[in-house]
UniProtKB/Swiss-Prot annotation:
<dbReference type="GO" id="GO:0004814">
    <property type="term" value="F:arginine-tRNA ligase activity"/>
</dbReference>
<dbReference type="InterPro" id="IPR014729">
    <property type="entry name" value="Rossmann-like_a/b/a_fold"/>
</dbReference>
<keyword id="KW-0547">Nucleotide-binding</keyword>
<keyword id="KW-0067">ATP-binding</keyword>
<dbReference type="InterPro" id="IPR001412">
    <property type="entry name" value="aa-tRNA-synth_I_CS"/>
</dbReference>
<comment type="similarity">
    <text>Belongs to the class-I aminoacyl-tRNA synthetase family.</text>
</comment>
<keyword id="KW-0436">Ligase</keyword>
<protein>
    <recommendedName>
        <fullName>Arginine--tRNA ligase</fullName>
        <ecNumber>6.1.1.19</ecNumber>
    </recommendedName>
</protein>
<dbReference type="InterPro" id="IPR005148">
    <property type="entry name" value="Arg-tRNA-synth_N"/>
</dbReference>
<dbReference type="GO" id="GO:0005886">
    <property type="term" value="C:plasma membrane"/>
</dbReference>
<dbReference type="InterPro" id="IPR036695">
    <property type="entry name" value="Arg-tRNA-synth_N_sf"/>
</dbReference>
<dbReference type="GO" id="GO:0005524">
    <property type="term" value="F:ATP binding"/>
</dbReference>
<feature type="short sequence motif" description="'HIGH' region">
    <location>
        <begin position="130"/>
        <end position="140"/>
    </location>
</feature>
<dbReference type="Pfam" id="PF03485">
    <property type="entry name" value="Arg_tRNA_synt_N"/>
</dbReference>
<dbReference type="GO" id="GO:0005829">
    <property type="term" value="C:cytosol"/>
</dbReference>
<dbReference type="InterPro" id="IPR001278">
    <property type="entry name" value="Arg-tRNA-ligase"/>
</dbReference>
<dbReference type="Pfam" id="PF00750">
    <property type="entry name" value="tRNA-synt_1d"/>
</dbReference>
């Protein structure tokens, strides 16, 4: 029995108790929850439902809790139910009922934990979206890991997710990039406002391989040649780095396309129809202050050129016209001002501001031997995705970036994350999976098969803890998806791995020597099979491998 199953059972029991006593059963909340008590001796699960309901139905919380506890003790699968404190209900499950989660996991396999929580939602998830002027820096790498994990997580809950990369190939930074390439190709110093690093020299050489006569072209053609070929080469490198990191995108949208084909003009025309566009001082303004922004925004400048927000408006409208009802933007720490701006833009189009969600990621610092690592050997300036992967590998890089809330700055200790020790969180979790895989191989050599027919024998306290943690997985995924917090999956996996290691140290799974196999052995094998499955499912969500051997 999972916590969700118990919550539904508690709700049904409460409805029957209220109806029996002539009280208003409609006062029941739509969703009833149960929690694991902080002190295990208090029971397997606890609920404050009586305290939530008492005032609404005109009774005392402890009295209502007593009625519910009495009714629960008559329900199959409930071993005991007791009232505690001001009206808590502490519940213990019968072993057989608690152990049913093993069967649920084995039957569901890779889909255990999935739900239809977000069924019908069409989600556009835009992340990374780095300028094609250099390799992915370490901050963008965090979004590459977290964004991909969030996409996988939302998919498990029934959402139709499209991962999108907004390709910033419009604006002055692309001109500076082209000028930097030209300078490198000519053997000249990097322009004062240009880009430096060995990657610039490498790309300049590749441009000349593709266009050997480029340096003899007139200035305008020269810049356009280095701009077009250089951007394509840089973006190919970015996509390859992301692919090797385990992050791929469904759609790549060019910012330049927002400024061609009339998309910006179309967006402004739509906004004029809503009355939210006006002219002042020779410029065109969007009335975003009416929708929560701190000031109105210039859309078309007085010189007739579009402001940066013009592309954002066209891009948002493009997403909505493609049918997305939720647009999630994952932006860097310097983009806090975009939250109100993008929500106001949605409202100006007549949409619910909740159509837009903006996640802001904080800084990432790399540490080696207690000292910050600041310089990239490849880029010559900032640290990159490739630097991190070279230092600790893809799995550790992804896990280290995902396991903390995105609104928290993180320090990645390169020595810790590359170590084969229990202090390394990804090693700790992966080792649990490898240990379980080895156990399955050893069982197969003994011709032992996991058996779910005697799960009532799993009555050791370490078995009970492991069973309860397995049952938490669906709710962890629902909560993580609802809050857009994939780090919760990492923390859950660490808890599960710890519970498994403690179980393994206390409960012998396989017979030893001449010992004959028993029903307890095969029941424990089933518990191990379920644990292995849940660890694999969780690692798949965060895009980390589940090794069979370590």
């Amino acid at each position: 029995m999972t916590p969700a199953d118990l919550a539904e059972l508690l709700k049904a029991t409460a409805a029957a108790v209220l109806a029996e006593r002539g009280l208003d059963a409609s006062a029941l909340p739509q969703m009833v929850t149960v929690e694991r008590p902080r002190i295990p001796e208090h029971g397997d699960y606890a609920s404050n439902l009586a305290m939530q309901l008492a005032k609404k139905v005109g009774t005392n919380p402890r009295e209502l809790a007593g009625w519910l506890a009495e009714a629960l003790t008559k329900v199959d699968g409930i071993a005991s139910a007791e009232v505690a404190g001001p009206g808590f209900i502490n519940m213990r499950l019968e072993t057989a009922a608690q152990a049913k989660v093993v069967t649920s996991v084995i039957d569901a396999g890779h889909s255990y934990g999935h739900s239809l929580l977000l069924a019908g939602r069409k989600v556009n998830l835009e992340f990374v979206s780095a300028n094609p002027t250099g390799p992915i820096h370490i901050g963008g790498t965090r979004w590459a890991a977290v964004g991909d994990a969030l996409g996988r997580l939302l998919t498990t809950q029934g959402a139709d997710v499209v991962r999108e990369y907004y390709f910033n190939d419009h604006g002055a930074q692309i001109d500076r990039f082209a000028n930097s390439l030209i300078a490198a190709a000519k053997g000249e110093p990097t322009p004062q406002d240009g880009y430096a690093g060995s990657y610039i020299t490498n790309i300049a050489e590749q441009v000349l391989q593709k266009a050997p006569d480029a340096l003899s072209l007139p200035d305008a053609e020269l810049r356009e040649t280095f701009r077009a070929i250089g951007v394509d080469l840089m973006f190919d490198h970015i996509k390859q780095s992301l692919h090797e990191f385990g992050t791929d995108f469904d759609v790549y949208t060019h910012e330049d396309s927002m400024h061609t084909g009339g998309r910006v003009e179309n967006a402004i025309a739509r906004l004029r129809e809503t009355g939210n566009i006006y002219e002042k001082d020779g410029a065109t303004w969007l009335r975003t202050s009416a929708f929560g922004d701190d000031k109105d925004r210039v859309v078309i400048k007085s010189d007739g050129k579009p402001a940066y927000i013009a592309g954002d408006l066209a891009y948002y409208l493009d997403k909505r016209q493609r049918g997305f009802d939720l647009c999630i933007y994952m932006l860097g720490a310097d983009h806090h001002g975009y939250i109100a701006r993008l929500k106001a833009a949605a409202a100006a189009f007549g949409d619910d501001p909740a159509t837009v969600e903006v996640l802001i990621g904080q800084m990432v610092n790399l540490v080696r031997d207690g000292q910050p690592v600041r310089m990239s050997k490849r880029a010559g300036t900032v640290l990159t995705l490739d630097d991190l992967v070279e230092a600790i590998g893809v799995d550790a890089a992804r896990y280290s970036l995902i396991r903390s809330s995105v609104d928290t700055a993180i320090d990645i200790d390169l020595a810790l994350w590359s170590s084969a020790s229990n202090e390394n969180p990804v090693y700790y979790v992966q080792y649990a999976h490898a240990r379980l895989s080895a156990l399955a191989r050893n069982a197969a050599e003994l011709a032992l098969i996991p058996d779910t027919n005697h799960l009532e024998l799993l009555n050791h306290d370490k078995e009970g803890t492991l069973l309860r943690t397995l049952g938490e997985f669906p709710r962890v995924l629902e909560t993580a998806a609802s809050l857009r917090e994939p780090h919760r999956v990492c923390r859950y996996l660490e808890d599960l791995a710890g519970d498994y290691h403690r179980f393994y140290d206390s409960c012998r799974v396989l017979p030893q020597g001449d010992e004959q196999p028993t029903d307890l052995h095969t029941a424990r094998l089933a518990l191990c099979q379920a644990t292995r499955q849940v660890i694999a499912n969780g690692l798949a969500i965060i895009g980390v491998t589940a090794p069979e051997r370590m």
